């Protein structure tokens, strides 16, 4: 969600001798997009995951916005990444000087229980399935727009295009809370 959602394409194209573009990434199951088996994708990912996740580019304005948000909010990163990527994830956040109150590397896409334990008010997500699951548990979700998450939304999900829009929505929510 803080990184470019298509960061993996160049590596996958090189490895599988393909020519996939970001426009073709219309679903979250990457092996289907590439036209390979899940096992083939898993083998590829396991070979390069540390390199891939250490070099993924950060989204425009994400660092600055998170730094501003941390002044009035707790910032938790809840990621579905595998546990073996926990140290790398901390290093990545520190490299970009991204402040946080906690990092939760779940090794699973199911984030609801952790979000409940942390009493999250807003969840920023790019996975459609995660957004739906979180929203059904009454979390407000800001779904960062990607080619692979453009499906119908419910009342607890707001589609956002960038980190400035995320900031504006959260700031508006904070002002409404203060007014009450």
Model-derived segments and their meaning:
Residues 112-115, 151-158, 169-171:
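Short, charged, surface-exposed secondary-structure boundary motifs
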């Amino acid at each position: 969600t803080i990184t470019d959602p298509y960061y993996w394409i160049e590596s996958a194209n090189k490895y599988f001798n393909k020519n996939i573009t970001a426009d073709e990434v219309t679903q979250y199951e990457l092996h289907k997009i590439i036209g390979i088996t899940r096992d083939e994708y898993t083998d590829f990912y396991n070979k390069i995951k540390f390199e891939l996740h250490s070099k993924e580019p950060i989204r425009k304005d994400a660092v600055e916005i998170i730094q501003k948000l941390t002044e009035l909010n707790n910032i938790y990163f809840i990621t579905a990444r595998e546990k073996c990527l926990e140290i790398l994830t901390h290093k990545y956040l520190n490299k970009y000087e991204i402040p946080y109150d906690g990092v939760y590397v779940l090794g699973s896409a199911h984030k609801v229980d952790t979000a409940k334990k942390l009493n999250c008010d807003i969840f920023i997500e790019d996975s459609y399935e995660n957004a739906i699951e979180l929203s059904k548990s009454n979390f407000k979700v800001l779904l960062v727009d990607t080619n692979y998450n453009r499906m119908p939304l419910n009342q607890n999900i707001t589609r956002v295009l960038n980190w400035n829009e995320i900031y504006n929505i959260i700031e508006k929510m904070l002002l409404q809370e203060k007014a009450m």
